[in-house]
Amino acid sequence: MRRTTVITIVVALIAGLAGIALMPRVARLGAQTTGDADLAGAARAAVRDPSGHRGLAVALVENGRIRTAGLGDRDRTGQPVEPGTSFEIGSVTKALTGMLLADQAAAGVVRPDDPLGATWPAVTGPARNVTLAELASHRAGLPRLAPDGILGWARILWSNVSGGNPYAGQDTDAIRSAADRVTPDHDERGEVHYSNLGPSVLGHALAARAGVAYADLLRARLLQPLGMDATVIATHADDLPAGRAHGGRASGRPLDTWSGVGYAPAGVGPWSTAEDLGRLAAATLAGTAPGADATTARFREDGNSHIGYGWFTTRHGDHEVVWHNGATGGFRSYIGLERATGRAVVVLGNTDKGVEPIGLRLLGVPEKEAGEAAPVAPVWIGAGLAVAFTFLGGLSLLGTARRRELDRVTVVAAVVWAFAYLGLAHRMGDWSVVPVWLWPLGAGLSAAGATLALTRWSALPVVDARVPWRRLLSVASSLLAAVLAVAAVSD
């Protein structure tokens, strides 16, 4: 066996073994339990597949009694989830914003059929004519997000790749400006089309009418009366609750928190606990929560669901559940109420694996009706990214190493890209559905390709003499792209 071949095999084996230590670690629900032991046991039994979950906080309301429990880990260091651990609650906040509308209507401050412009005179565009009730029920014909041009969509795309906050920098003025610019879709107005912009406009409109910020109005009218002292809105990183859960993908990648002011009424920035949301659920079931009338089903969504002010009502077989869920970068949430049985449930999770089926099972909904957690994206996308990026760099590098005409700058670019691809695979691939041992194989393959290329190093020119400027420009662009790719997926 040639010396070069032996060296290549040895280096590949070493890289593969090192890759085992560095390979992705899929989140898995930990064994730790806090709070009510019986509820914790029931919740764990409701988790059909612990893979993809890291920690859960649960509240169950029965006959006015609230029980809470924590399962698993709140972060990657193994700290336990407790009933008082704070989680991002995402779009569950839309239900709270709907309750604010019902509360302010009951107080005579506004009427649900008031036009937006009468409540928030600063909005002067075509959307000023939509009603508060339409905003609360996703029937205003507004888009899902504020129109923000190419740069806005680029920011969202970058945040999805990098695991960042797609709503950073969006304040109240940005929402008002968006409401001014947007023209409601007349074909969609009156029908339920889910929107983050609509509830955000509603929340800030109610706050403007009251002469306070949205967070202050929510605290004064809903949170304080219910004793929800742990529920806060983080407008920036300094506001994050102490001892909070840390969110991430089911595949193990940590993700940034979402914070901000503009989309806070729709779920960007609010944090709560199973204890606090259990209080909300109990009071709403009892009809004593401010704005509890928001849960009344008023408008038809489809044959199986209706919507009130923020709250959905859906029939699951013999069970009619009033509910809302939430999803931010690395968190999932669910609150469900069943009036017929006087029961309610709250489930909070710190990965992007859905928790709705867990909540429905705890309410007694049959397995078939409870279903399974829907993936964030089609499974084939995450699996394809994992496999393709894992092996693409190594295979490309092997091809480069075998080229007859080669130069050093090309080798450098190929090596950098090979390991950039490994980083992309590690961070962007869905390793909850792809065997994680493939990643060390990819690392070994890339190391083998790099070794073969570097064995020719001394005999290679710095740059191909035929078109040096074109080669240098191409390699420089390639290296820049590789560096950006690595930056995007770094913690």
Where are these regions (language model features)?
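Short, well-structured active-site flanking segments
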Residues: 84, 96, 103-121, 209-237, ...
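Secretory-pathway/luminal and periplasmic proteins that interact with or process carbohydrate-rich
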Residues: 67, 123-130, 140-148, 215, ...
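Active-site-proximal loop and beta-strand segments within enzyme catalytic domains
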Residues: 54, 62, 74-196, 210, ...
